[in-house]
Amino acid sequence: MYEPSRQISSFYIAGFQYWDGALVLSELKVGERLRLVPEFDNPHDSSAMAIYRGKTKMGFVPGSENELLALMFFYGHSDGFELRVLQVSPDKNPWEQVRVGLYVTDAR
């Protein structure tokens, strides 16, 4: 069966409470695509992968999930992945308000 993409991971956005995600929380829709941006010069984690909605930085891919993804981006394979909103829970603690899914896309 053909699938245009396959989910390989899901997680809450790390550091959501420290960035500007709250500014766009009410606008987020399940299924909406978000943008992954590597931060290879990040002083805390050279594998850091920031998550953006438009120009709004929402937080990061958790450190436990970012190393292989950052490596793929470093070697030019960024087109093979997409990040989508899976759950928006405004009433939860900030670190559990937005859960996203990481998908590998079919390039065949």
Region spans (language model):
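Conserved active-site motif detector
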Residues: 1-108
